[in-house]
């Protein structure tokens, strides 16, 4: 990690040796570490998992995250961590990795319970506006950001690819879905035409739950974890799922 910091942040050897490293264990996909430099500056390094343990749609997922974060930072007013360096050469590490700014505050999921109703309302309204700005970014084709060759001209085609990839992955590891694979594939495949209503590829975060929103003093300080971002239908966003879930 210290050698990576020398390369990514331009540290000298003495600065690297005095850098403090702390593993962050809240994530479920990438490995993440907090680095504190000798001058008390802090940053985060994220390291992608080994490629032999990935689902199909997770290929090139770190490339997708970096692209989505940089695009959001450049084209919107949504607060996202600044990326200092992205390295996919595998020269210093066998996996892709990137260094980014450390956000101030706490994940919204960790502090929402002791916030006032007014503060929660303000945070969630602000989050909705941020989400709308992300969805306001438009692409040229549909599909996962990190899988350009598999992107399609229609949302119907792109969603069909996502479905088949997920089912193929499940069959490969003998995952028990609770129903037969064809019971999932058949009804969806026969109704894919309804997706033709989605005519413009929008940037979709796809994992914008409270744990990926950092807040401080009643305000959003940043949004993280864009690795599952894709060009698709904004109704795939996390909070729209509540519309169909029974209370």
Identify the residue ranges that each predicted region occupies:
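Juxta-kinase regulatory segment immediately upstream of eukaryotic protein kinase catalytic domains
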Residues: 1-17
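Structural motif
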Residues: 9, 73-76, 245
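Extracytoplasmic/secreted proteins and extracellular or luminal domains
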Residues: 12-14, 76, 216
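Short Pro/Gly-enriched beta-strand edge/turn motifs at strand-loop
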Residues: 12-19, 64, 186-188, 193-195
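A conserved long alpha-helix in the C-terminal portion of kinase-like catalytic domains
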Residues: 13, 173-183, 189, 221, ...
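ATP-binding pocket architecture of kinase catalytic cores
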Residues: 19-175
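Active-site Asp-x-Gly
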Residues: 156, 197, 201-204, 209-247
């Amino acid at each position: 990690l210290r050698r990576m910091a020398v390369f990514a942040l331009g540290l000298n050897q003495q600065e690297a040796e005095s850098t403090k490293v702390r593993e962050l264990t809240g994530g479920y996909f990438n490995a993440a570490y907090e680095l504190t430099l000798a001058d008390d500056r802090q940053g985060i390094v994220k390291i992608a998992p080994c490629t032999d343990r990935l689902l199909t749609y997770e290929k090139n997922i770190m490339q997708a995250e970096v692209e989505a974060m940089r695009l959001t930072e450049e084209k919107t007013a949504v607060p996202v961590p600044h990326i200092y360096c992205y390295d996919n050469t595998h020269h210093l590490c066998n996996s892709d990795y990137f260094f980014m700014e450390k956000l101030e505050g706490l994940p919204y999921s960790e502090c929402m319970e002791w916030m006032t109703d007014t503060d929660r309302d303000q945070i969630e309204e602000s989050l909705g506006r941020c989400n709308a700005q992300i969805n306001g970014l438009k692409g040229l084709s549909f599909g996962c950001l990190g899988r350009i060759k598999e992107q399609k001209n229609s949302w119907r085609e792109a969603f069909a690819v996502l479905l088949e990839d997920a089912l193929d992955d499940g069959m490969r590891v003998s995952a028990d879905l609770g129903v037969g694979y064809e019971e999932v594939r058949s009804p969806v495949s026969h109704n894919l035409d309804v997706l033709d209503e989605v005519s413009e590829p929008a940037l979709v975060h796809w994992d914008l739950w409270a744990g990926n929103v950092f807040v401080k003093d009643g305000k959003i300080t940043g949004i993280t974890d864009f690795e599952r971002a894709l060009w698709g239908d904004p109704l795939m966003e996390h909070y729209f799922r509540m519309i169909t879930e029974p209370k």
